[in-house]
């Protein structure tokens, strides 16, 4: 059994991103994995202050007192991180970006030993909109943190059943 943290960065509870996240979560849980999902658009997560408290007196803890601490608690022993978001202006939603920026205290300079894998689900109105998100995914999560890519899934327009099936297969094969 694997522990997985899923961050859903979509404000639309029935939108394409939510459908992709739900397909993953259901299949992963059916395969015996524990999935802890956070809908970051419904959480109180402030932007990083760049104060460096976390890398000084905070000893890895962020000075801000908001809902991000719930995510930090789960990241400490998770094996996989799944990021799901709609694309706005060639990048992920601001809410998910804000949460990722706050990973600075928990994942930098080094991710927890347990964290090995990552996957990303993106939805947009056009198949040409993923370049910015892909650049960040490859550079930050695969490159800098050295996580293993378990899949980068995209859906332009209405999410297709074929895409959902690919996500389900990946979840079951973990």
How should each PLM-predicted stretch be described?
Residues 94, 109-151:
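Short, glycine-/small-residue-rich phosphate/pyrophosphate-handling segment
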Residues 87-89, 125-126:
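Short glycine-rich anion-binding loops that position phosphate/pyrophosphate groups of nucleotides
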Residues 1-84, 90-105, 143, 149-150, ...:
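N-terminal beta1-alpha1-beta2 submodule of the flavodoxin-like/Rossmannoid cofactor-binding fold
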């Amino acid at each position: 059994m694997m522990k997985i943290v899923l961050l859903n960065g979509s404000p639309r509870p029935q939108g394409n991103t939510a459908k992709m996240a739900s397909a993953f979560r259901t299949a992963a849980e059916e395969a015996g994995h524990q999935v802890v999902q956070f809908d970051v658009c419904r959480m109180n997560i402030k932007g990083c202050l760049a104060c460096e408290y976390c890398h000084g007196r905070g000893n890895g803890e962020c000075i801000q007192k908001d809902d991000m601490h719930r995510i930090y608690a789960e990241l400490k022993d998770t094996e996989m991180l799944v990021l799901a978001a709609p694309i706005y202006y060639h990048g992920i939603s601001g809410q998910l970006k804000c949460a990722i920026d706050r990973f600075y205290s928990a994942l930098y300079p080094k991710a927890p030993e347990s964290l090995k894998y990552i996957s990303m689900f993106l939805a947009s109105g056009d198949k040409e909109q993923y370049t910015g998100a892909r650049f960040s995914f490859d550079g930050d999560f695969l490159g800098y943190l050295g996580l293993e890519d378990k899949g980068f899934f995209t859906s332009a327009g209405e999410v297709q059943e074929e895409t959902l099936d690919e996500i389900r297969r990946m979840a079951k094969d973990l």
